[in-house]
Amino acid sequence: MDSSILDFVVVGAGMAGASVAWQLARDGGASVLVLERESQPGYHSTGRSAALYEEHYGPLQVQALTRASRAFYEQPPQGFVQAPILAPRGVLYVGTAAQKDLLDAAHAEALLHSPQARRLGPDELKALVPCLNTTLLVDGFADDGARDIDVHGLHQGFLRGLRQCGGELRCSAEVRALAQDGGVWTVDLADGSQVRARCVVNAAGAWADALGALAGAAPIGLVPKRRSAFTFAVPDGMDAGHWPAVISADEGFYFKPDAGQLLGSPANADPVAPQDVAPEELDVATGIWRIEEVTTLQIRRPSHTWAGLRSFVADGEMAIGWDASPVPLPGFFWVAAQGGYGIQSAFGYSLLARNLLRGEPLDARLAAQGVQPERLSPARCQRG
């Protein structure tokens, strides 16, 4: 066996690439290299996420992958992280009288897996979050099971674990070409070097279709969507540290405590080309207006603004599995289209990717939550 040929090259060192690489390397049975185009891992979507662990957020398979992740997040392996991955937060969905039907549907869905989700009236809403204008927001429900996620800690845990298991991360390593011959992929990098591997894992985030095109794969129809966010000061005299995340019934805004401030967003999803995305002033202004309209908060000037990309295929589920182009590419594997759910479900989808990549049976933790690999296969995107 040629020792210069790796088992797996993972392209992309965001949460998807880091978690899958760790899963592949964790028992020491495979050689794994992660290639990251940027000078640091997690620069794009992962590093800009306002992640919340919420089991009834996203389409059904995302919810299943999220539920399958909880036990790992609550009790990771010894030494995986230096601080807890999850911290108590809770979530509060709020709505006007006209949004009762939306809240009814969301509450019913939440109860399927979060029996603690409870409906609240105006007085109860205001008791939880005193800044709410309960003349307008008259209905809602709370789920105390939602958690804040230490995104950086989780991401670094996967990368540290990868290195401890003999894997390697190489930054400033842009892929320029991909070619397969005799069951081996040759990956040409921008610095003129080459890497050879039996399998390429496409975890390139918003650039996953572009990487697929370099390999000759049919596109999965990935659409990156910009979401803007901002932080702002908590009003004098208010203690917001214990507030839940507040989300409007129509997902027109959200805000939550964040490191001594409040973090807000218009929850926009604007289709854009893959890029180092920046916030639009109109997005931020819209978010501020929507939050101020239904609260007593006055956001005179955000302390920080940013934007991130959330990438989707048509049905909103992820694309995880072997290439299924009309002429499939052997050894080319997709881990893409995480949408806005790639942090909360990272352990689940990376475990699924490991099972598929290594030809293992579906892990019992995934099966128990109703994960169905065929519903996540790129085949549904590449073949229509």
Regions found by a protein language model. Give the residues of each.
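Beta1/beta-strand and adjacent pyrophosphate-binding region of the FAD-binding site
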Residues: 2-16, 33
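Glycine-rich FAD pyrophosphate-binding loop
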Residues: 25-46
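Helix-loop-beta segment of a Rossmann-like dinucleotide-binding subdomain
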Residues: 82-93, 106-107, 113, 119-122, ...
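Helical element adjacent to the flavin cofactor pocket in flavoenzyme catalytic cores
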Residues: 142-191, 195-198
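Central helical "cap/lid" subdomain
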Residues: 193-242
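Active-site lid/adjacent beta-loop-alpha segment flanking the redox-cofactor pocket in flavoenzymes
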Residues: 218-221, 234-331
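C-terminal catalytic lobe of FAD-dependent flavoproteins
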Residues: 293-384
